Amino acid sequence: IYSHDSYNAPDYTNSIKWNRKLEYKEVFEYYKALIRLRKGSPLFRMNTKEDVNAHLHFMHNDDWNCVSWKLEKDGECYVIALNPYYENRGFGLPEGSFYLRLDESGKMNKQPVSGSFVCPPLSAVVYKRIKNI
């Protein structure tokens, strides 16, 4: 039963349905990967407007309905892209080599990529710049 404002609803409505963890395992694993990503970099934990303004930069896209941005600080750089379309869309990358840190299924791919990448339909991806050693 769904309730828009369930603060005073019975436990049945507000209880955690633990069996759904198995039913929606892909979603559970994706959320775990998002939490791991957030914990892994202070760039995903900025909590002031000044920090966000200093380290977030929107990137140019030929398609105005697609959006991508760069988070960069102290040599660490991430590119995040959102594709709202039902087909693949291409995005550009800043200078350097990147790897796919998080795809639409929560997976990572350490294969280096540079110049551009393709974002799958109806998804978000996160790329991380490979640090030069």
Task: For each feature predicted by the language model, list its residue ranges.
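Loop/helix patches that line or flank the sugar-binding groove of alpha-linked glycan CAZymes
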Residues: I1-G96
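Conserved active-site loop/cleft motifs that coordinate metal ions or position small ligands
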Residues: V79-L82, L100-R101, K128
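C-terminal beta-strand-rich structural cap/linker in extracellular carbohydrate-active enzymes
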Residues: K110-I133
